Amino acid sequence: MGISKPLPLFSILVLYFSLYTITPTSSLASLQDQFINCVQRNTHVYFPLEKTFFAPTKNVSMFSQVLESTAQNLRFLKKSMPKPGFIFSPIHESHVQASIICSKKLRMHLRVRSGGHDYEGLSYVSQIDKPFILMDLSKMRQVNINIQDNSAWVQSGATVGELYYRIAEKSKVHGFPAGLCSSLGIGGHITGGAYGSMMRKYGLGADNVLDAKIVDANGKLLDRAAMGEDTFWAIRGGAGGSFGIILAWKIKLVPVPKTVTVFTVTKTLQQDVGNKIISKWQRVADKLVEELFIRVLFNVAGTGGNKTVTTSYNALFLGGKGTLMNVMKKSFPELGLTFKDCIEMSWLESIAYISGFPTHTPTNVLLQGKSPFPKVSFKAKSDFVKTPIPESGLQGIFKKLLKEDIPLMIWNPYGGMMAKIPESQIPFPHRKGVLFKVQYVTSWLDSDKRPSRHINWIRDLYSYMTPYVSSNPREAYVNYRDLDLGRNTKDVKTCIKQAQVWGANYFKNNFNRLMMIKAKVDPENFFRHEQSIPPMM
């Protein structure tokens, strides 16, 4: 594609001479009008205001509806949380370019949202820059599949569920190895790595990106050739909101069989005597055939004295159940899997199943962009385990889980292709040596009067896990944002010092390279948030 046509020289001159004409005392309503006028002057493609621009001063109910539409964590929709001054939903690439020019001109901070799954709400809440504009990419969701060359272009506003559905429309033997949650926005999802149930066979979504279209801090539209290999490296796992606005990804499609097999086998503590099943899983999950992905979900069931921890072994096998049973009998007989437990289906049907929809749910549910679970307030954290957790450690985990109202812990197996890809291939470094990734989640309803107790609980569990997880650094998954690890301030020098800590957690030795690339492509730190990559100074 190369570099798109540059914006008119007049627009650049307007930007230059007007940088100092907007005063901090300008009213928000005035800024809204100026932003609209500026975008209209800097794009050749018309946009209907009633469908693309939403402000509390214009229509409060519509503004709230759009703001809440894809915000996944209700914790960040509370009245006490900062709200954008207004929301702009572009429908064309040039609108994104113009928005960058105009937000710079008006000295307004910009946040960008594709699917709204940021665990700390950073794609739609700013606590360090106010006022701010929310650019919502949900109207840019085209998916173009090319089966002949095993590729697809997908715009950032599309969900992974939409992408999977459109692939299956064209072919029953092609897929893409990205997220387990079908409502994830593909734009931000891939920037953090994008793991899914085929990661052991094909790696991450970010490992299977061929090209991208981004708009940089100068409002230029770039593809891989134009942005250069450093920037292309950075955006595939270096997390969103740092290097530019991702408009679209070109992805590599991977082969899948016509028939796959899924199962979910749930055990209580009483059924797993001596923790033999979970202990065996720790020893074999990363060593099983690459076609088999078995994750474990820890929940709490029952009440009062009957309360217990359950472990659900939730799996996808790229093949039929006969072959799967042979693998399980040989490698993991302790689970006691039976033919009755196994369900054969298409790869697309398995997406809905793994996402949490009931078996036999029509696959067009994936086009709705919604989770099968109700929205709640939640806090999450992550870890990586490199040696099996001993019996004593497991007992302590179970005791912690039984103390919380709605706890969830998920163990996702690594190994396979994940162990073959070098740590520096893309910014995502969690590769060889990782047995499994841990996700901790606690959630609560809005009616809960003491949300702080849930956050204290998860921090206590995280502290308890210290001896059993990676160290120096204690690794974390950037798509499970955790501001407990640290956050940026407006002072760039202070930012860099603080960022070295959480940067090592997320990116290990890749963090310095990310900061150097940031300094080259966005030295003024236009794209920033509480955990964005700061420019190296």
From Swiss-Prot:
One annotated GO molecular function: oxidoreductase activity
Keyword Ribosomal protein: no
Disulfide bridge partners, by residue number: 38-102
Sites of the 6-(S-cysteinyl)-8alpha-(pros-histidyl)-FAD (His-Cys) crosslink: 117-181
Annotated glycosylation sites: 59, 306
Cofactor comment text: Binds 1 FAD per subunit in a bicovalent manner.
SUPFAM superfamilies xrefs: FAD-binding/transporter-associated domain-like (SSF56176)
Domain FAD-binding PCMH-type intervals: 80-256
Signal peptide segment: 1-27
Main localization (coarse): secreted
Names of the cofactor(s): FAD
InterPro entries: BBE, FAD-bd_PCMH, FAD-bd_PCMH-like_sf, FAD-bd_PCMH_sub1, FAD-bd_PCMH_sub2, Oxid_FAD_bind_N
A cellular-component GO term for this protein: plasmodesma
Modification(s) after translation: The FAD cofactor is bound via a bicovalent 6-S-cysteinyl, 8alpha-N1-histidyl FAD linkage.
Keywords: Cell wall, Disulfide bond, FAD, Flavoprotein, Glycoprotein, Nucleotide-binding, Oxidoreductase, Secreted, Signal
Location of the protein in the cell: Secreted, Cell wall
Similarity comment: Belongs to the oxygen-dependent FAD-linked oxidoreductase family.
Name of this protein: Berberine bridge enzyme-like 26
Organism of this sequence: Arabidopsis thaliana
